[in-house]
């Protein structure tokens, strides 16, 4: 990809700035010599690799995971030579600097933005009292769905009306489906797939609680989206999630299904407290993840990079 872009830009001189979204390929090093250039890194993929290895079964699966992530060697060579990097959280900045051996002074933090005309509180919609929503954008261990499923199985003895709506698509006959059968959760779990943004927002708005169970997030779109929709949040105390959620949700130890069960029960017993937090969180999300504000931050970065490039 980087080589194709490099060749293309050799013959096109009408761009003010080039922005690369985490290809981290050698061609980018050539491009930054001839154009004002910014690299966007959401988070270091070394973290995905780490958790994939932890949850791999057997030698062959680990072998193929290592083979798949072989591009990380290229990433680690290219990243330290990039002049300007933007990432969406202070936690990602720390991890990028550490894993890719980059001077943190070359990394700036600008959060991701939301479409707040879609992800917003719907005052005309009453949430379902025992409906919980979670998002698993990929059926991988990194998203921590196992923890949520086990916590739901533990809470059902006291709260049998609990239902979990999962925004995501499990692999057919894969790990997640096996766990659901083993825990006898089939009648308590529904998967929502191929949703529009409006439909995703509805899942937040119609739920009484959102659970974010990821083991690692460079930002955490589901957390920000749920906050913007005014949905109470319980989240793992992992990576960038405390930074995104601030004091507007309940945190628990990543991977601890018993702790998550206790948090869910605490929510059921103290709904008004959590709903008050959610109202404050919605205001915070609207101020912090507002694209108009974020666009101005990016514009400031673009102008600075262009000016530096033109004066060198």
Q: Where in this protein do the model-derived segments appear?
A:
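Conserved donor-binding/catalytic core segment of Leloir-type glycosyltransferases
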Residues: 125-143, 149-152, 165
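Aromatic "clamp/platform" in nucleotide-sugar-dependent glycosyltransferases that forms part
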Residues: 215
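Short hydrophobic beta-strand element within catalytic cores of glycosyltransferases
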Residues: 232-235
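Nucleotide-activated donor-binding/catalytic signature segment of Leloir-type glycosyltransferases, i.e.
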Residues: 176-198
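Carbohydrate-associated surface elements
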Residues: 91, 113
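Conserved acidic donor-binding segment of nucleotide-sugar-dependent glycosyltransferases
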Residues: 250-257, 266-271
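Membrane-proximal helix-turn-helix segments that form the acceptor-binding/catalytic region
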Residues: 62-85
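Short alpha-helical donor nucleotide-sugar binding micro-motif in glycosyltransferases
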Residues: 194, 202-207
